[in-house]
């Protein structure tokens, strides 16, 4: 499987190698439980084949709000706190509402990485021409700490006025831009800063100034407005190396870039804190409309697991065995409906997961 050429998060935002071979698991909401289930089936196949003991701890039973969404209650908070204190990475199912933003703020998960590296075995599922897909290898880096998503919000004047604050402190911008510059220096040495000077003049100016001031290592720096960046990502992603952006822009860019992957169900990401906390999650939403139908694509969740294994547990051997199994099954034409090509065999979530697990089990024990 072709992954982004330098998928790992640079220090200080790398989770590093945990001393304990253990992961925490949060089921998420919507399709989360079903795709996490497949990730666990595949992981257990990898554990059984390799003989590597990995302990799995699940978060407490979900407690729903009245909108059928996860709430960051005390039980969840204690689970995350315990995992992060012990340097245990978390594999997270998709979640929506305010949950993910509150989680990132509470535990200072300031930076989100989303690799965009199209899978060659499903090129026929993409809207883009094959030559553009082959050359595409982009790392999206998004701030999680400020902007509209973390600003004050509410109602005024008896509900006739709604407001949402977009605020950035220079220190917040410096943190994420420093990480992006370091990441670019480890890759092809190119960084695109995405803002919107006309619509958000002061915030855009702060991001531009910060990038120019911090770029002391000679990274090739460029600037692009968010609307154009969305178009370019959706039509010619091969032109980019690393992209960094404010919170909301990064959210939109991540979903737009999924065009190159063939489906949002193939997308994955990771959130890191400066202290080493790591939450690996799909880069797509909870898809409540697909919940319980056994049709969701589990591959993004499996790739999320691979990233966790490789970069937090330092088990690249297990990650590679799962990636090879995914490639084998997709190459055989078995796909969920969202990535089906003209000659594909459309299978269910559980069927695809079972086939990938079987492919893992059929491999020789991985060599570390």
PLM segments and residue spans:
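N-terminal glycine-rich phosphate/adenylate-binding segment common to multiple enzyme folds
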Residues: 67-163, 248
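Glycine-rich phosphate/nucleotide-binding loop
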Residues: 117, 234-334
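Extreme N-terminal starter segment of soluble prokaryotic enzymes
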Residues: 18-24
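N-terminal beta-loop-helix "entrance" segment that forms/cooperates
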Residues: 51-77, 233
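Short acidic loop-to-helix transition motifs that present clustered carboxylates
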Residues: 121-123, 224-231
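Glycine-rich phosphate/diphosphate-binding loop of Rossmann-like nucleotide-binding domains
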Residues: 24-46, 158-227, 239
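Buried hydrophobic positions in well-ordered alpha/beta secondary-structure cores of metabolic enzymes
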Residues: 29-32, 88, 141, 180, ...
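Glycine-rich phosphate/pyrophosphate-binding loop and the adjoining helix
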Residues: 151-156, 161-192, 197-201, 321, ...
